[in-house]
Amino acid sequence: MENNQIIEALQQSKLFSQLDINDLQEISKKAKVRQFFANDIIVWQGQPSASLFLILNGIVAVKNIIGKQEHLLAYLMPGNSFGEVGILENRPRSATVSALSEVDVLVIQRDDFLSILQKHSIVAIELARILGEYLMQSNRRMNSGKRETKFVLILNTESEVGSTGLGT
């Protein structure tokens, strides 16, 4: 992935969208692109929180494992990020994140992300807003007494013309 594509992805993310082009160029130099395939585990619950991930394309599932039970916490799409809480708290990852499709992520190491937060207060403020949003969603789910179910439809875009993977 070229540097201008990384900058464009940063501009479209909630976390970095308010930064100017010079700041985005600086951040893009610290970031690395990694690719995962469907069913790959991107991070495991319990691993050290060494980096922030920004989804460039694809869909991931965030799951928490308690005992032998797996709990789906969220589906994340392009523009979403994960790994922020572990970096801020310097604790192991609180969830396992797996690829549901081919996924490209931008990876920013912990120390680099912390220096970005110190240098760019607007990113820290946006991160606080995003984390507050996550907390409110979590509280709504707990208070409703019901499990919310979200459906994500992933179509195989590489099928032959005229064929479908649904219903056959």
Show which residues each predicted segment covers:
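Cytosolic regulatory regions built on CNB/CRP/Popeye-like sensor folds
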Residues: 1-166
